[in-house]
């Protein structure tokens, strides 16, 4: 169950980053175009905001790591990558959605799609971590229980 949910949420989050996030004038802008513009204009030159803007293109890679690790039964890696990517996308989408709008600049539906899918990715990753920890503790409680195989960890 968790590999499917994490994969779908990660794919939706990555897909949402390519949807229109902002409309400026007559043009829709994706998250990548928006952050490239912020960087070019010097609004995100230093500090945590600068790092957040520059590391944004790595989000699809981290989402792919979360999905692949989940299918491989590596729930700690998957949960960490999924929760990190989900929280990162969720935070940035909330900032863009909460920004003041003008008659020339306003947010589009892609930012809401990304916000929702990132929330699902974060929740699925945290639930996967909780399930993995529960199974880990249960395995330690019964010393006679055989070691799990990669196939048995997929649910």
Language model features with spans:
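Compact integral membrane and secretory-pathway proteins
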Residues: 1-155
């Amino acid at each position: 169950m968790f590999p499917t949910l994490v994969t779908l949420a990660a794919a939706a989050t990555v897909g949402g980053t390519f949807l229109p996030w902002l409309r400026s004038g007559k043009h829709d802008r994706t998250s990548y175009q928006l952050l490239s513009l912020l960087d070019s204009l010097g609004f995100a030159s230093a500090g945590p905001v600068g790092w957040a803007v520059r590391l944004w293109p790595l989000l699809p890679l981290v989402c792919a790591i979360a999905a692949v690790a989940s299918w491989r039964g590596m729930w700690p890696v998957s949960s960490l990558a999924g929760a990190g990517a989900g929280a990162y996308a969720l935070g940035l989408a909330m900032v863009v959605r909460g920004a003041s709008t003008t008659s020339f600049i306003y947010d589009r539906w892609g930012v809401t799609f990304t916000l929702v899918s990132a929330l699902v990715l974060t929740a699925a990753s945290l639930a996967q971590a909780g399930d993995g920890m529960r199974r880990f503790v249960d395995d330690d409680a019964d010393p006679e229980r055989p070691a799990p195989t990669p196939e048995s960890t997929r649910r």
